[in-house]
Amino acid sequence: MFKRTHYDIVICGAGPAGSMAALALKKSGLHVALTDAATFPRDKICGDSVSSVNKRILREVNPELETDLLDFSAKSNITQARLFSPEFRALQVSFKKTGHCIRRIDFDNWLFQHARQSGCDVYENARLKEIEPNDKGYTLTYTNGNKINASVVIGCDGAHSVVAKKLAGFKVDKHHYSGAVRQYYKNVAGNDGNTLEVYFLKDYLPGYFWIFPLSDNTANVGFGMLSQTIADNKIDLKKSIHRIIHNIPQVAERFKDATPLEQPIGFGLPLGSKKYRISGNRFMLCGDAASLIDPFSGEGIETAMESGKFAAEQAVNCFAANRFDAEFMYGYDERVYKKMWPNFRNHYLLQRILGNRTRLINTLIRVGNIPWVNKQIPKLFY
């Protein structure tokens, strides 16, 4: 199966984090393998929001990537967001830079195909089963029995990361984890195609319901809550989203002529509200595998791509210095958290303060319509 028995770097997972790492290693001169359990194109349950920051990250790696994304046809252009309080008062905020909504099956495949052309060896349908240390790095064993050796492993294998569990001992912490469901709909009324919509609903806090517009008059509709709240209250997210869409008049009116394109599908979000050790001897974790999802917005594509880029650059430094020990590798952790922790910390504080405080959320939505306050709100999204 594998072209080589040993690689300088094996990237486990070819989503935004892994593909970006591969792209950033294009000119490194290192032997790189990019592996994924799936065969592309494949779906990834998500809100499908691609912020303007993602374009900056693409530009830093290769300006042609940003240009190619702008020419991508299957996207909506996002210029604003509309937030609804529990009393259904609306707050509209405009973004200085245009973001996009793109189905993950399309966006991830687009990025993956660029990574495939970066010069790395790509292996699809390669599901990691075990990872064990050896005298030159790690031996990775896949479910089909094939093995590969790596000097450095970059774990980009998502919320249920094998690399994170085996090498960093990660376990789910429900206080820093969210559950959500997504359901695609056609013909949802009332959205002009360029607005992210978020509802804070009285009986469904702490959490929010969203309607994000895609191309072709399709919408990504979803609902998410903290996992600890879900467990404590025995909440069924699939039943909850059904009740929201059909039983809340202000929402149901928008869905009376809409058609569901699938059943609700659940997914987990490891939040960046808690710091972890995301590297060690000869390995790094990126994106969802490193719990780098924004604790308030649930945005994870941007941080996945940036952490993938950072990991690639750290790996190059490791080979240049011939140092792969945990102390040297910790430079990756420091860079990631220097960039991301201020937002994570502030957004986690906001998440905790708002909680299920209906009156407070109502008040903040009202205050948000004050012009100088309104200008600060886009930072929660893009």
Where on the chain are the PLM-derived regions?
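Predominantly flavin-linked oxidoreductase catalytic cores and closely associated redox partners
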Residues: H114-V251
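C-terminal helical "tail/cap" subdomain of flavin- and related membrane-associated enzymes
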Residues: E313-Y382
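Glycine-rich FAD pyrophosphate-binding loop
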Residues: K26-C46
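FAD/FMN-dependent oxidoreductases across multiple families
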Residues: E130, K147, T229-A311, C318
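Conserved Rossmann-like nucleotide-cofactor binding loop
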Residues: A17, F40, H160
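Conserved hydrophobic helix-helix packing surfaces used for dimerization/oligomerization
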Residues: I9-I11, V32, F283
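A conserved beta-strand/loop capping segment in the N-terminal third of enzymes
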Residues: E60-W110
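Beta1/beta-strand and adjacent pyrophosphate-binding region of the FAD-binding site
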Residues: F2-A17
